[in-house]
C-alpha cells in the first residue's frame, strides 16, 4: 500500500522541514509551491529527504488587493491529481504548519493500512506561541472534534473551485460509516501562531484577501482560553 502526504507552500521556510520530517513513514511527500520568493529552502528540503519532491503550481493564479496567489481549490486539486498520477492508495492533505504528533507517527502506517473506511479524521491541537494551546478550537461543543486528514485515492474527492467557498469538500460521503474518527492521544499539532510576526502576517493577508473583518485578527480574541500542553501533544 502506498501513502502520499501532500502540502501547499508559499514562503514556508520555517515550517517545511518539520512537516516533511514528520512524514518519513509515508512513501511520498508532494510539495506544490505557489512561487515562493526564494526556492532555496524547497531544494534543500527535498535534497535531504528522499521521499520528498516539489514543483510549482501549474495553473492560472489570481490577483486581489495586491496579493497574487494560486486559487485555493485549484491548488489543492492539482496536488491530489499529482498524487494519483504517480500512483497512491491514500492521500494525506494538511497545512505546512501542522504535523502529526509522535504517538500517531509511531502507528500511522499500521492504522492507515488496516483502515476499512474511505476517510480518516484527526483532532487538531492549536498551539499559541510557546504558551500552550486553545482547547476551544479543538472541542468547540465540549467534545473533541476531528476533521478530514486522509482519504482513499481515486474516489473523486476534490475541493470546490468556487473562491467564495474555498474549502467546501465536493465528494459526498453517503454516511458516517465511511469515516474513521481517531481521538486523542492521536492528534495533529497545528502551529498557526508561533510568534507576533506570524500573527501580523496572517492579519494582513487575511484582511486583504477576505475583507475588513480580519483587520483585528488575533487568536486571543476568538480562540478561547489558553491551557497547558498535555504530555502527548508533541
Model-found features: residue ranges?
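Short beta-strand/loop segment that forms part of the nucleotide-sugar
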Residues: 27-36, 55-57
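Active-site acidic Asp-centered loop
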Residues: 34, 94-95
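Short, well-ordered alpha-helix to beta-strand connector turns
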Residues: 26-27, 88, 96, 117
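Active-site-proximal specificity loops/subdomain of glycosyltransferases
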Residues: 38-93
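Catalytic-site signature of metal-activated, phosphate-bearing donor transferases
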Residues: 66-81, 99-234
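A short acidic, amphipathic alpha-helical/loop segment
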Residues: 18-22, 44, 106-110
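Short, well-formed alpha-helical segments that are part of the catalytic scaffolds
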Residues: 11-25, 31
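Cell-envelope/extracellular polymer assembly enzymes that use nucleotide-activated donors
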Residues: 2-4
Amino acid at each position: 500500500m502506498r501513502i502520499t502526504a501532500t502540502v501547499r507552500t508559499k514562503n514556508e521556510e520555517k515550517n517545511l522541514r518539520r512537516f516533511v520530517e514528520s512524514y518519513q513513514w509515508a512513501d511520498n511527500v508532494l510539495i506544490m509551491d505557489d512561487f515562493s520568493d526564494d526556492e532555496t529552502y524547497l531544494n534543500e528540503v527535498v535534497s535531504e529527504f528522499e521521499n520528498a519532491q516539489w514543483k510549482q503550481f501549474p495553473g492560472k493564479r489570481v490577483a486581489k488587493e495586491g496579493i497574487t496567489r494560486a486559487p485555493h481549490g485549484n491548488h489543492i486539486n492539482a496536488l491530489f491529481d499529482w498524487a494519483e498520477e504517480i500512483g497512491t492508495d491514500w492521500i494525506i492533505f494538511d497545512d505546512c504548519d501542522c504535523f502529526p504528533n509522535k504517538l500517531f507517527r509511531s502507528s500511522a502506517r499500521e492504522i492507515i493500512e488496516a483502515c476499512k473506511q474511505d476517510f480518516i479524521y484527526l483532532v487538531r491541537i492549536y498551539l499559541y506561541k510557546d504558551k500552550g494551546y486553545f482547547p476551544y478550537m479543538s472541542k468547540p461543543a465540549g467534545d473533541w472534534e476531528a476533521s478530514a486528514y486522509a482519504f482513499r485515492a481515486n474516489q473523486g474527492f476534490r475541493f470546490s473551485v468556487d473562491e467564495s467557498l474555498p474549502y467546501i469538500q465536493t465528494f459526498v460521503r453517503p454516511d458516517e460509516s465511511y469515516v474513521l474518527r481517531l481521538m486523542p492521544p492521536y492528534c495533529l499539532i497545528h502551529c498557526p501562531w508561533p510568534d507576533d510576526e506570524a500573527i501580523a502576517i496572517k492579519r494582513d493577508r487575511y484582511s486583504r484577501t477576505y475583507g475588513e473583518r480580519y483587520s483585528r485578527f488575533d487568536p486571543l480574541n476568538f480562540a478561547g482560553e489558553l491551557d497547558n500542553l498535555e504530555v502527548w501533544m508533541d
